[in-house]
């Protein structure tokens, strides 16, 4: 065991491998070798250079987004009467940026005021005062309990609370949605981007979009792919959802703006690509999107509020992109990597020659030659023997 270890160590320390060129005339190996080289060449030129643009250096972007909406809706509700809803009423927040909500449906509890009343049965049902702990508020409570058990309606008793009365009852969601006209509302997106590495700035109001065109155009993925004005119904439709269904309980829609620019061409070819994605799943545990807000007012010295439970569509605008431009350093790096990949052909063909073909032992003898230093005079004797062999071969060819 020790002797073998010494031999392995000596071989590692004192042996040197040098390549040996062997010309092999074998049609099968030759064809495989050229086919592998062809595949590597197509990969380097077609994929690495042309598709992945390995000759370019790239830069990410910084972005700013602002939006404006337009449209009107009319409702007729008990306690509120006829009401016209404009952009100041149905958009949250008022200063739209890359994330905003358009109200499409709501439940209103009119003229709430601070006082005592029975809480909603969702907060808990009682039979007597002992079931209502004073001052205690459960998770779904709508006020502070007074300790009394009072009638909520003719059949149910609940704990009395001190809070905004009458309490909200949101069991029945209006169908169809109250602001179904939102399907025809229009959304104007302004997007400014910059590629700081290349000092290039662009807006989605590209050269083809002018003032006259913007007054009449609506985005369409084939007819008007650069128009920055979008109809909400079309956006929801392209996201794979139904607007009427989505408007009832609300949902989330993603709008992506992709800037993938090749700056080796003129900058006017750097244009945005819009895509729409449905981020709402009706079958999940908590479907829809909703929140609450209140309108406060004073009447005869008493503070009142109209409480709105709002169902709306939330739009999230996401900007992504990358720009590329020719650079000698990544070009040379890619070329060097491609040349290195050509070595795969040699490795595979050596594997075929030395381990798979029937004549593999013969090729091994031709491929590998072992030389050992035999001391002074050994080189001269080996050279003389080689010369004699070559002379004999020459005489045989001429005879």
From Swiss-Prot:
Q: Which residues lie on this side of the membrane: Cytoplasmic?
A: 1-28, 359-399
Q: Where in the cell is it found?
A: Cell membrane
**Sugar attachment sites:** 153, 184, 242, 300
Q: What is the protein's major site of localization?
A: membrane
Task: Name any one GO molecular function.
Answer: identical protein binding
What does the record list as GO biological process? apoptotic process; calcium ion transmembrane transport; ceramide biosynthetic process; insemination; monoatomic ion transport; neuronal action potential; platelet activation; positive regulation of calcium ion import across plasma membrane
Which superkingdom does the taxonomy of this entry point to?
Eukaryota
Annotated residues for binding of CTP: 68, 70, 140, 186, 290, 292, 309
Where does the record place the modification Phosphoserine? 387-388
Q: Where is this region: Pore-forming motif?
A: 331-338
In which residues is ATP bound? 68, 70, 186, 286, 290, 292, 309
> Which controlled-vocabulary keywords does the entry list?
Apoptosis, ATP-binding, Cell membrane, Disulfide bond, Glycoprotein, Ion channel, Ion transport, Ligand-gated ion channel, Membrane, Nucleotide-binding, Phosphoprotein, Receptor, Transmembrane, Transmembrane helix, Transport
Catalysed reactions listed for this entry: Ca(2+)(in) = Ca(2+)(out); K(+)(in) = K(+)(out); Na(+)(in) = Na(+)(out)
Gene3D superfamilies for the chain: atp-gated p2x4 ion channel, atp-gated p2x4 ion channel domain
Q: In which tissues is it expressed?
A: Expressed on neutrophils and platelets. Expressed on urinary bladder smooth muscle.
Q: Which residues carry this modification: Phosphothreonine?
A: 389
- Signal peptide positions (record): none
In what way is its activity controlled?
Activated by low concentrations of ATP (<1 uM). Undergoes rapid desensitisation. Sensitives to the ATP agonist:alpha/beta-methylene-ATP. Modulated by cholesterol.
Question: Assembly state and interactors?
Answer: Functional P2XRs are organized as homomeric and heteromeric trimers. Forms heterodimer with P2RX2. Forms heterodimer with P2RX4. Forms heterodimer with P2RX5.
Which family is annotated?
A: Belongs to the P2X receptor family.
| Record's comment describing the protein's domains | The N-terminal 20 to 23 and 27 to 29 residues seem to play a role in the cholesterol-dependent gating of this receptor.
What NCBIfam families does this protein's entry cite?
P2X
- What's the protein called, per UniProt? P2X purinoceptor 1
Species of the source: Homo sapiens
